[in-house]
Every structure is written in structure tokens, then in C-alpha cells.
């Protein structure tokens, strides 16, 4: 097979980039190791920044998001058993977030690509990327039936996530910056209407808790736990009891319902510099991981491809390589801003085994809920910086 841009990974980064390039007449092939049903059912992030929403609208894939997504104008911070609303729209000139599950966005992008009749190959694993320092890099592929094939490209985009082959190849020649946090999240998806129409970030003596939502009938809730937490040790009843304790305030009740799924999410930060090796460029989780507290992972993936798409077009149409040459530097400036914000939110909201740090972060949160200037800074970062 031959194409101009080979895209490894059919997640938000890969599919959004394919859509942006499609609208400019650039030929692409997207390969995905998993099945269509798997990527369309995988529950992940659900908070879209203003810039992400605007880009998806401009790309012609925002219709269902606009119809079904939940627009939020603020979030709630809870400390010392009291709630404080952070009015993001008022603090940022009207900018908002939209709650719309990543799996729903993936469904929209897959449907748009298939409707265009463009190449999207599921159950096709990229086993290696070769000739990356030449003008004809190749992706070596293995189909579900075990047969092998090759995809020759002008450029390869590694959007196959943290565990994909693309990151491994770039990391071997990059600096990798990492931080592991001393806590994790025990998350549940519950079949119950949300008990609040905005996200609640609660700091409690027992640990952090988050009340979130995926739809008017589905709630997403999290508890701070240890990285090696034994999920089997938690019954559904124990999970609800602890959520009631950490999220509870006078005069408010957390509605309970059947737990549909649960899991433990580790907290880590990872950045690979540069996000490029020859004709291979990384986007999304292949290049960086952030803790989920700041709701930045999906939005960074979209920001990466917003930066990358015009540079690819310039390179292929005009043989202009300077844009590709500075892609990593430009993207990483945004990545490190998001890392800083995510780190700040994570430490401020979680109980810390370091007693001094724990007290310091409690003081930080109390300051935030009492200071408009501090709230404005958080709001600007939460709704997202302008896309390039």
C-alpha cells in the first residue's frame, strides 16, 4: 500500500488528524490494532475544552456533540466540607467546557471517515516502523489472520498511545521525563442520574473524590486510592459508602445506582522530547501522559494535531519542512503548560503521605476558593488555552 500520510492509531488524535487532512485533499491511511467495537466502547475522558469543541465543529464532526454534549459553565471545589463554585465562563470571557465521552467522539470520527469512503483498517497491528530517516518510511503491518503487509508513506504519525510501537521508537532516541504520583483513582461508571449538574472536586481527610458525569443518566465517580489498590477488596456497597463520606455535605444526597464497570487508574506524568524521529511524528498519548485531574489528556491530543495538520500540508504541497522541524517545540510548550496545571490540580486536591506537603496543599486549596485571581488562573487553564 502507498499513501501520503500513514496514521498509526484510530483514537481521537489519529482520527481527528485524518479528518483535518482529508478536508485539504491529503491522502491518508489509518491503521488500528483493535476492533471497531473496542475503540467505540472504550470509556475514557469526557471533558472537552472550548478549543477542542471549536475545532471539531470546524472539521464537520461536531453535530452530535452539540446535540448531546452537556455544556458546563463552572466546576465545584469542595474543601473542609464546604462547596465553592468556580464560575469558569464568567472568569474567561464566556468560554465553556462540554462533557461528551471520548468513545462518542471516536464513533463520530469513525462514521465520518467511513462515510467518505477513506481507508481505515481495524484489527491491523503495526509491528514496526522502518526507514524513518528516508523519504519513504514504511509501517510493517500484521492483519488479524496473521498475514503481513506494508504501508509506504511520505510521513508517519504515531498516534497509537502510550504502549504503542511509535512511542517506543521515539523514546529510544529521546529524553523521557517522568513522574509517578503516590496515589491512583478507583473509578466507577454507574447507571444513575448525576447528583449535580457540574463536576465536583472534593478534598477530604480520607482522600480525593470526584463526581462527574457522562450523560443525563450515567454518572462517573472516582475515589483516591493507592497505586496497588486491590479492586476486588471493594464491594459496590463499600464504594458508595466512601463516595458518600468524601462527597457529602449538609443538605445534599449522592444518588446511588448499579455500578456498570470499575477500575484503578494510576497517576503519572510522562513527556518524550522531541516528539519526532525522522519522518515519524508523535501525537497524543504516544508523546505525553498527564494525570487526569486537569482533564487535559484528550484535549492535548487534539491540540497536537491542530498544530501538526497545517505543517503536514505545507510539507506535502510546498516541500516546506520548517513547520515539521518546529512541531515538537511548539507542541511541547503547550504540553508542559498542561503538565504544570495537571500537577498543580493533582497535588492540591489529593491527600499526600508527606504530611508537610499535605498541609501545604490544603492551604493552597483554601486560598483558591477565597481568591478570584487564583480562580481565574485555574479557569483559564481548565477551559483551555487558545489552539495554535
Describe the predicted segments one by one.
Residues 208, 269-271, 287-298:
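Glycine-rich phosphate/pyrophosphate-binding beta-alpha loops
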Residues 41-44, 49-116, 339:
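Active-site-adjacent segment of FAD-dependent monooxygenases/related oxidoreductases
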Residues 266-282:
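FAD-binding beta-loop-beta segment adjacent to the flavin cofactor pocket
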Residues 22-43:
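Glycine-rich FAD pyrophosphate-binding loop
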Residues 295, 310-388:
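C-terminal helical "tail/cap" subdomain of flavin- and related membrane-associated enzymes
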Residues 111, 118, 124-128, 133-263, ...:
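Conserved FAD-binding catalytic core of PHBH/FMO-like flavoproteins
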Residues 1-13:
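Beta1/beta-strand and adjacent pyrophosphate-binding region of the FAD-binding site
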Amino acid at each position: 500500500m502507498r499513501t501520503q500520510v500513514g496514521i498509526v492509531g484510530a483514537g481521537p488524535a489519529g482520527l481527528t488528524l485524518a479528518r483535518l487532512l482529508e478536508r485539504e485533499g491529503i491522502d491518508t491511511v489509518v491503521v488500528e490494532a483493535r476492533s471497531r467495537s473496542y475503540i467505540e466502547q472504550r470509556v475514557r475522558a469526557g471533558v472537552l475544552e472550548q478549543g477542542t469543541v471549536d475545532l471539531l465543529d470546524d472539521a464537520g464532526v461536531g453535530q452530535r456533540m452539540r446535540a448531546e454534549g452537556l455544556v458546563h459553565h463552572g466546576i465545584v471545589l469542595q474543601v473542609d466540607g464546604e462547596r465553592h463554585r468556580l464560575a469558569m465562563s464568567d472568569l474567561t470571557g464566556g468560554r465553556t467546557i462540554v462533557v461528551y465521552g471520548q468513545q462518542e467522539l471516536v464513533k463520530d470520527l469513525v462514521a465520518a471517515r467511513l462515510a467518505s469512503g477513506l481507508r481505515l483498517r481495524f484489527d491491523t497491528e503495526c509491528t514496526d516502523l522502518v526507514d524513518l530517516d528516508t523519504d519513504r518510511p514504511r509501517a510493517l503491518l500484521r492483519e488479524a489472520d496473521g498475514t503481513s503487509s506494508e504501508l509506504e508513506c511520505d510521513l508517519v504519525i504515531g498516534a497509537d498511545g502510550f504502549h504503542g510501537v511509535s512511542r517506543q521508537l521515539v523514546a529510544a532516541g529521546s529524553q523521557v521525563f517522568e513522574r509517578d504520583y503516590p496515589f491512583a483513582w478507583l473509578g466507577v461508571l454507574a447507571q444513575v442520574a448525576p447528583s449535580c449538574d457540574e463536576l465536583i472536586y472534593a478534598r477530604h481527610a480520607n482522600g480525593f473524590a470526584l463526581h462527574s458525569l457522562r450523560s443525563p443518566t450515567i454518572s462517573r465517580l472516582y475515589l483516591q486510592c493507592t497505586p496497588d489498590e486491590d479492586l476486588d477488596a471493594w464491594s459496590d456497597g463499600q464504594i458508595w459508602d466512601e463516595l458518600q463520606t468524601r462527597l457529602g455535605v449538609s443538605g445534599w444526597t449522592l444518588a446511588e445506582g448499579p455500578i456498570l464497570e470499575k477500575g484503578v487508574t494510576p497517576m503519572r506524568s510522562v513527556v518524550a522530547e522531541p516528539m519526532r524521529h525522522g519522518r515519524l511524528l508523535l501525537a497524543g498519548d504516544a508523546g505525553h501522559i498527564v494525570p487526569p485531574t486537569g482533564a487535559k489528556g484528550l484535549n492535548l491530543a487534539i491540540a497536537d494535531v491542530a498544530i501538526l495538520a497545517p505543517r503536514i500540508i505545507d510539507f506535502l504541497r510546498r516541500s516546506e519542512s520548517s513547520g515539521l522541524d518546529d512541531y515538537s517545540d511548539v507542541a511541547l510548550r503547550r504540553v508542559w503548560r498542561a503538565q504544570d496545571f495537571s500537577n498543580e490540580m493533582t497535588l492540591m486536591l489529593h491527600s499526600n503521605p508527606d504530611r508537610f506537603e499535605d498541609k501545604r496543599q490544603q492551604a493552597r486549596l483554601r486560598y483558591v476558593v477565597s481568591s478570584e485571581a487564583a480562580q481565574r488562573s485555574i479557569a483559564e487553564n481548565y477551559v483551555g488555552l487558545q489552539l495554535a
